[in-house]
């Protein structure tokens, strides 16, 4: 899936920003979170997040749910490289395994399990 953030910002600028963030906040993970294009779920108000390294994927999902004001009965799925990461996994381990060459971790979310595969 194409990232709008990548389309809007040149690689060198993204890489420099991620490096600056990691140097200044070495206990944080730079994350870009975008909605899957064809999903009917609400669009998030901001794409860039600075996530504590010890946050779990489940806790990050909770943050996203709050930001898009998703009611408890509605489902949300997040994807890293088009697969569902384990809920108990630490964001730091997901970052180490899946960070982009620009230094950001790209996460997409959807109201439906669009890709259907777990890591």
Curated annotation (Swiss-Prot):
Membrane topology reported for the UniProt record: Lipid-anchor
Post-translational modification: The C-terminal 3 residues are removed by ATG4 to expose Gly-116 at the C-terminus. The c-terminal Gly is then amidated with phosphatidylethanolamine by an activating system similar to that for ubiquitin.
GO terms under biological process: autophagosome assembly; autophagosome maturation; cellular response to nitrogen starvation; mitophagy; protein transport
InterPro entries per the UniProt record, alphabetical: Atg8-like (IPR004241), Ubiquitin-like_domsf (IPR029071)
Chief location category: membrane
Keywords: Autophagy, Cytoplasmic vesicle, Lipoprotein, Membrane, Protein transport, Transport, Ubl conjugation pathway, Vacuole
Record-marked site positions (Cleavage): 116-117
GO molecular function: phosphatidylethanolamine binding
Gene3D superfamilies membership: Phosphatidylinositol 3-kinase Catalytic Subunit, Chain A, domain 1
Cited CDD domains: Ubl_ATG8
Lipid-carrying residues in chain (Phosphatidylethanolamine amidated glycine): 116
Propeptide: 117-119
One Gene Ontology CC term in the entry: cytoplasmic vesicle
Subcellular localization: Cytoplasmic vesicle, Autophagosome membrane; Vacuole membrane
Family the entry assigns: Belongs to the ATG8 family.
PANTHER family the UniProt entry points to: MICROTUBULE-ASSOCIATED PROTEINS 1A/1B LIGHT CHAIN 3-RELATED
Name of protein: Autophagy-related protein 8
Species, as recorded: Phaeosphaeria nodorum (strain SN15 / ATCC MYA-4574 / FGSC 10173)
Lineage: Eukaryota, Fungi, Dikarya, Ascomycota, Pezizomycotina
